[in-house]
Amino acid sequence: KCCMRPICMCPCC
């Protein structure tokens, strides 16, 4: 999931 990446550009963050 993108939220678990160092750089997040998703709505979930």
From Swiss-Prot:
GO CC, any one term: extracellular region
Modified positions (4-hydroxyproline) in chain numbering: 11
Leader sequence segment: none
GO molecular function, one term: toxin activity
Residue ranges of coiled coil: none
Record family assignment: Belongs to the conotoxin M superfamily.
Domain-level remarks: The cysteine framework is III (CC-C-C-CC).
The protein's name in its UniProt record: Conotoxin Reg12g
Species name: Conus regius
